[in-house]
C-alpha cells in the first residue's frame, strides 16, 4: 500500500470514528428526525442530560450533570434551565428557586457550604430586589439588593448585638442611618463608605447627646452636648 492510500485511509478513519467520539451521543425518542420525548444526551466532556426533549431541544423536566460535578434538576426550555429548579454544587452548596434563560431569576434560596444563607430575589444570576442574607458568624441583613450587594434601604443585625438600619450603596452604609451599639449607645446621622460622615448625633447610656459634623468617623470642628434634662 503506497503512502497516498495510507493517508486516505487514515483520514477516512478519523472522520468516521475520531469526529464521532467528539459528537454528543443520544439515546431516546425521536420525531421527524429530531430528539422529541424522553432520552439521554451524553457529551464528550462527560456532561449528561436525562429528561424531556422537544423539537431537538432540551425542553420540559430534566437532570443535567456538569463536567465539574454540579447537578441541575428542574425545568428546561430550548436547551436552557427555565422555571423551577435545583442546582446542587459539587462542594455541597444548594440553590433552589426560579430560572430564566439559564440564570437565577426571580425568588430563590441559596445555601452555601461556607454557611452563608440567602433567601430572596435574583436577576441575571445576581441578588437583586428584596432579600435576607445570613452569615455564619451570626450577622443578618434584610433589605434591598442590587447587583449582588446590599443597596437601598436595609437593616443589618450583627452577631455581637449591635445593629444598623438605614441606607446602603454598593454594599456599604451610605446616607442616613441609625447605628445601635452593643453597649447601648447609638448614632443617628449620615454615613459614607461605612463611616460616620456628615452631621449626626451620638446618644450615650446616661441619656447625654452629642451632635456634630463627622468626617471618616472623626469629629470635624466643634460639637454640642445636650444633657439628659435638656440643658
Task: List each language-model region with its residue ranges.
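Bacterial N-terminal signal peptides that target proteins for export
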Residues: 1-8
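Polar, glycosylation-prone regions of secreted, cell-surface, and some intracellular proteins
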Residues: 31-34, 42, 48, 65, ...
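Extracellular beta-strand solenoid repeats
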Residues: 40, 63, 86, 109, ...
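Intrinsically disordered/low-complexity terminal segments and short unstructured peptides
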Residues: 6, 22, 39-41, 62-64, ...
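Bacterial N-terminal signal peptides
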Residues: 8-16
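Conserved anchor residues at repeat-unit boundaries in beta-strand-based tandem repeats, strongest
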Residues: 25-36, 48-59, 71-82, 94-105, ...
Amino acid at each position: 500500500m503506497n503512502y497516498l492510500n495510507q493517508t486516505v485511509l487514515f483520514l477516512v478513519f478519523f472522520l468516521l470514528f475520531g469526529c464521532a467520539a467528539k459528537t454528543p451521543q443520544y439515546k431516546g425518542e425521536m420525531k421527524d428526525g429530531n430528539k422529541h420525548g424522553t432520552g439521554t444526551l451524553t457529551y464528550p466532556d462527560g456532561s449528561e442530560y436525562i429528561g424531556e426533549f422537544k423539537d431537538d431541544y432540551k425542553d420540559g423536566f430534566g437532570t443535567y450533570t456538569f463536567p465539574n460535578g454540579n447537578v441541575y434538576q428542574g425545568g428546561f426550555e430550548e436547551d436552557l434551565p427555565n422555571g423551577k429548579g435545583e442546582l446542587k454544587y459539587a462542594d455541597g452548596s444548594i440553590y433552589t428557586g426560579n430560572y430564566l434563560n439559564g440564570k437565577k431569576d426571580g425568588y430563590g434560596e441559596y445555601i452555601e457550604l461556607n454557611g452563608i444563607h440567602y433567601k430572596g430575589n435574583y436577576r441575571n444570576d445576581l441578588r437583586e430586589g428584596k432579600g435576607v442574607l445570613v452569615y455564619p458568624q451570626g450577622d443578618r441583613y434584610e433589605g434591598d439588593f442590587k447587583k449582588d450587594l446590599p443597596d437601598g434601604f436595609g437593616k443589618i443585625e450583627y452577631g455581637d448585638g449591635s445593629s444598623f438600619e438605614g441606607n446602603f450603596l454598593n454594599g456599604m452604609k451610605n446616607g442616613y442611618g441609625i447605628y445601635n451599639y452593643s453597649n447601648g449607645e447609638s448614632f443617628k446621622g449620615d454615613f459614607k463608605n461605612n463611616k460616620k460622615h456628615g452631621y449626626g448625633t451620638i446618644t450615650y447610656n446616661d441619656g447625654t447627646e452629642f451632635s456634630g459634623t463627622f468626617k471618616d468617623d472623626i469629629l470635624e470642628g466643634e460639637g454640642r452636648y445636650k444633657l439628659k434634662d435638656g440643658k
